[in-house]
UniProtKB/Swiss-Prot annotation:
<feature type="transmembrane region" description="Helical">
    <location>
        <begin position="36"/>
        <end position="56"/>
    </location>
</feature>
<dbReference type="InterPro" id="IPR037270">
    <property type="entry name" value="PSII_PsbK_sf"/>
</dbReference>
<keyword id="KW-0602">Photosynthesis</keyword>
<keyword id="KW-0150">Chloroplast</keyword>
<keyword id="KW-0472">Membrane</keyword>
<dbReference type="InterPro" id="IPR003687">
    <property type="entry name" value="PSII_PsbK"/>
</dbReference>
<comment type="similarity">
    <text>Belongs to the PsbK family.</text>
</comment>
<comment type="function">
    <text>One of the components of the core complex of photosystem II (PSII). PSII is a light-driven water:plastoquinone oxidoreductase that uses light energy to abstract electrons from H(2)O, generating O(2) and a proton gradient subsequently used for ATP formation. It consists of a core antenna complex that captures photons, and an electron transfer chain that converts photonic excitation into a charge separation.</text>
</comment>
<keyword id="KW-1133">Transmembrane helix</keyword>
<feature type="propeptide">
    <location>
        <begin position="1"/>
        <end position="24"/>
    </location>
</feature>
<dbReference type="GO" id="GO:0009539">
    <property type="term" value="C:photosystem II reaction center"/>
</dbReference>
<keyword id="KW-0604">Photosystem II</keyword>
<keyword id="KW-0934">Plastid</keyword>
<protein>
    <recommendedName>
        <fullName>Photosystem II reaction center protein K</fullName>
    </recommendedName>
</protein>
<keyword id="KW-0674">Reaction center</keyword>
<dbReference type="GO" id="GO:0009535">
    <property type="term" value="C:chloroplast thylakoid membrane"/>
</dbReference>
<dbReference type="Pfam" id="PF02533">
    <property type="entry name" value="PsbK"/>
</dbReference>
Amino acid sequence: MINIVSLVCIYINSVPYSSIFFLDKLPEAYAFLNPIVDIMPVIPLFFFLLAFVWQAAVSFR
């Protein structure tokens, strides 16, 4: 139980700092990758949805 509480506290303390990374811009040499970088945070959601599509295809065995 203490581990869960400590993980929640660590997450809450890191939230203000994680938003800093979203405000940064890529260096000019990597500016052509901006569209890919914008989509990257959504990629894990595609895997999550793929699991449901896969289960629906096998009739939720």
